[in-house]
Regions:
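Intrinsically disordered, low-complexity segments enriched in small/polar residues
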Residues: 27, 38-40, 73, 108, ...
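Extended aliphatic helical segments
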Residues: 22, 30-31, 73-76, 100
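Basic/polar, cationic surfaces and motifs that engage anionic cell-wall
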Residues: 1-12, 46-50, 67-69, 76-139
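Short, surface-exposed glycine/acidic/tryptophan-bearing loops
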Residues: 57-74
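Short, well-ordered helical secondary-structure segments
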Residues: 31, 60, 102-104
Length: 139
């Protein structure tokens, strides 16, 4: 079993309201990026449904230098529909509720893990909101 010390949250960096599926992300990661598998463990759709992308026993490909000991949660969205991919918190109410659900579950499985946004490790806006609004779940 992998030692998990971080939960790292991401956005798909797609315009507000545009749905992306696990298959879409997998195609981008595997076909376009030539990765061995999809990078995220979980993807939260616009309707708040949580989709398993990658077994937690397998390291993701989502945050250079931190993949080995982390779980990746990603939500669909994160950019304004302005044609410029401007970072924006586009979470739907359903996605916000889904974050509470999945982060609560992950904290129960990995009580020593800390919560982070991708932007804490890379020069990015991802996940386009302050993930630490959910820190109360990790107390």
């Amino acid at each position: 079993m992998r030692e998990i010390n971080r939960i790292i949250c991401h956005c798909t960096a797609t315009p507000e309201g545009r749905q992306q599926t696990v298959a879409d992300i997998k195609r981008m990661h595997v076909v376009d990026n030539h990765w061995s598998h999809i990078g995220y463990h979980y993807l939260i759709y616009l309707d708040g449904s949580i989709h398993n992308c990658l077994d937690e026993s397998i390291p993701g490909i989502h945050c250079s230098g931190y993949n080995k000991h982390s779980i990746a949660v990603c939500y669909v969205g994160g950019c304004a529909a302005d044609g410029k991919l401007t970072a924006k918190d586009t979470r739907t109410p359903e996605q916000k509720a889904a974050f509470v659900k999945i982060l609560t579950q992950l904290h129960k499985r990995y009580p020593a893990a800390t919560l982070h946004g991708h932007r804490e490790f890379a020069a990015k806006d991802c996940p386009s909101f302050d993930i630490h609004e959910y820190d109360y779940l990790f107390k």
